């Protein structure tokens, strides 16, 4: 749900979540958008934030105890501020989560669970310390240790050289965090480099895990089917919707792979491509700098990225591996500037895209929401407040969109967050908002204008530098060359400026900008998972590249997934899940 960051925007760079089949029946406060039927239904959707997010009484007097200062970071749900305890003058970080940003019951549960888990975890040098929580009518406030040393990748690229020994030290720290989590019955579920910050700017600063917004409690042998996480770091069994704590070892293995070579092991330009690459599990150990990497390191990465969770190394086995156990003795040979360059480009491009997303995120006017509501009403022929499969299918036909039944089924599965087989107005509107936000050129135009300071229809290098300097990515950190590299990559015709078409092409390649919306990515990855089940487990059994685990095969037979190989819907100008394309 965010972090105690003292660096720019946090969130999944890729990443970064779907239909939930609950393991418990605990009552929950609904926080989804509500339509006020006493008003003109076509006027607007009225969002009613929950009156209480945290289950137990929490003090609402944060401003009596703390002075909130400058902004440290910003994510999809909250803004992190420096805060000072009035009585002691001690500095902390305060994450303010606006209730207006919590658009679904799932979002509310994420906040509740994050607080509960941070209270449960013990004090540990590599886990950010949680102090206390507050709640008032507008927001939830999480007060925790402040981390001012920057992100893991920032520290790597700022050093003059980078070695295998440094990667071993980082990997050991991450695995020790995973061990503590598992010992206390917690699966992290979203391990990625940007969820680790250094406590301060010194060379001896501790690396700390700072975000538990997607973590969950587990019991021995318990399995989960909710798709969460950031695609590049997601284990194959998550996509197959049957997983346990083993997924954290996989994610740590992906991080280690990136630390050693600078790029993710599974890469594609679409979410579907990434998912298939993960399931296929083909890992490249041939390209530079892998020939320089020790056999022990490569062996460890392979065993952490074992596609079978039951033969994958456990966290304890990884920590006992000689390369990790003797991290201080790992080769100290420079892996080359190429690794640092790749990591820096990877980092800055993601931040550029996420800055665009921040601008896009708040630009959806009430008039467009009203249009979505009107569309729902048109489709809801029996006026019972829910869309059945038939109503959605027939409604799409009425507005000129003839969609195959399989794709309609996929859409239903993606949007039906309570799993009752129908779409409420809340579910339809919430998903539509997020998909529209990600696919609409009009919103990208608004973001483009933010960078085009002189209004000449192009983004020039100096304009990009100024915009990214706002996020501490420019001159202050000596990143001029990296910004030039980004500019060169985006400027496809090499005329020294970025047109809107080039800007749009950048934003619609890769997945990170789309996956930054948690609701969007949950729905999208769920739909992809259903599709992959059908492709991998047809009537004749699993294909050759499928994982043939008994539990996964049993689970697959329970799914009634569409046969179609693509999903691309456009409901008028309002609904276009652009990420679901072949």
UniProtKB/Swiss-Prot annotation:
Binding site for ATP: 72-80, 95
Top EC category: transferase
Catalytic activity, as annotated: L-seryl-[protein] + ATP = O-phospho-L-seryl-[protein] + ADP + H(+); L-threonyl-[protein] + ATP = O-phospho-L-threonyl-[protein] + ADP + H(+)
Region feature Autoinhibitory domain, mapped onto this chain: 330-360
Binding locations of Ca(2+) 1: 380, 382, 384, 386, 391
Binding site for Ca(2+) 4: 491, 493, 495, 497, 502
Pfam families with a match to the protein in the record: EF-hand_7 (PF13499), Pkinase (PF00069)
Domain EF-hand: 367-402, 403-438, 439-474, 478-513
Biological role: May play a role in signal transduction pathways that involve calcium as a second messenger.
Family, similarity comment: Belongs to the protein kinase superfamily. Ser/Thr protein kinase family. CDPK subfamily.
Protein name: Calcium-dependent protein kinase 24
Taxonomic lineage of the native organism: Eukaryota, Viridiplantae, Streptophyta, Embryophyta, Tracheophyta
Gene designation: CPK24
């Amino acid at each position: 749900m965010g972090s105690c960051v003292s660096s720019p925007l946090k969130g999944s760079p890729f990443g970064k979540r779907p239909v939930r089949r609950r393991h418990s029946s605990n009552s929950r406060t609904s926080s989804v958008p509500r339509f006020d039927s006493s008003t003109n239904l076509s006027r607007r959707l009225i969002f009613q934030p929950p009156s209480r997010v945290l289950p137990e009484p929490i003090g609402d007097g944060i401003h009596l105890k703390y002075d909130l200062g400058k902004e440290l970071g910003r994510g999809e749900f909250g803004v992190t501020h420096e805060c000072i305890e009035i009585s002691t003058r001690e500095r902390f970080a305060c994450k303010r989560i606006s209730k207006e940003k919590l658009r679904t019951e799932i979002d509310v549960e994420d906040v509740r669970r994050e607080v509960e888990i941070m209270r449960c975890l013990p004090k540990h040098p590599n886990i950010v310390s949680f102090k206390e929580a507050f709640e008032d009518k507008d927001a939830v406030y999480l007060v925790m240790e402040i981390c001012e040393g920057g992100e893991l990748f920032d520290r790597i690229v700022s050093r003059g050289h980078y070695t295998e020994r440094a990667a071993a030290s980082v990997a050991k720290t991450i695995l020790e965090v995973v061990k503590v989590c598992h010992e206390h019955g917690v699966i992290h579920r979203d391990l990625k480099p940007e969820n680790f910050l250094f406590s301060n700017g010194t060379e001896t600063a501790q690396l700390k895990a700072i975000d538990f917004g997607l973590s969950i409690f587990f019991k021995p042998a318990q399995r989960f089917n909710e798709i969460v996480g950031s695609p590049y770091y997601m284990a194959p069994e998550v996509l197959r919707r049957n997983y346990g704590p083993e997924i954290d070892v996989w994610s740590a293995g992906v991080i280690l792979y990136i630390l050693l070579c600078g790029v993710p092991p599974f890469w594609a330009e679409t979410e579907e491509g990434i998912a298939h690459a993960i399931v296929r599990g083909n890992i490249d150990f041939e390209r530079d700098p892998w020939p320089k990497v020790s056999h022990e390191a490569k062996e460890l990465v392979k065993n952490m990225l074992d596609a079978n969770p039951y033969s994958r190394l456990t966290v304890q086995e990884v920590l006992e591996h000689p390369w990790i156990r003797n991290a201080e003795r790992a080769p100290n040979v420079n892996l080359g500037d190429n690794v640092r360059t790749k990591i820096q480009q990877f980092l800055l491009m993601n931040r550029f895209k996420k800055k665009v997303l921040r601008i896009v995120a708040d630009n959806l006017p009430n008039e467009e929401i009203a249009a979505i509501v009107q569309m729902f009403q048109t489709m809801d022929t029996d006026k019972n407040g829910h869309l059945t499969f038939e109503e959605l299918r027939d409604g799409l036909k009425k507005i000129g969109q003839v969609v195959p039944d399989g794709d309609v089924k996929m859409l239903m599965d993606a949007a039906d967050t309570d799993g009752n087989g129908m779409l409420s107005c809340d579910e339809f509107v919430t998903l539509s908002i997020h998909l529209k936000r990600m696919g609409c050129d009009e919103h990208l135009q608004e973001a483009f204008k933010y960078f085009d300071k002189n209004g000449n229809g192009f983004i020039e290098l100096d304009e990009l530098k100024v915009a990214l300097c706002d996020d501490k990515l420019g001159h202050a950190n000596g990143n001029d060359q990296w910004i030039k590299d980004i500019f060169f990559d985006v400027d496809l015709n090499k005329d020294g400026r970025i047109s809107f078409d080039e800007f749009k092409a950048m934003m619609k390649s890769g997945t990170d900008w789309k996956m930054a919306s948690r609701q969007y990515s949950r729905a999208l990855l769920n739909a992809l998972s259903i599709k992959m089940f059908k492709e991998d487990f047809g009537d004749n059994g699993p294909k050759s590249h499928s994982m043939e685990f008994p539990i996964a095969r049993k689970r697959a037979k329970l799914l009634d997934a569409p046969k179609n190989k693509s999903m691309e819907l456009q409901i008028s100008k309002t609904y276009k899940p652009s990420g679901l394309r072949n």
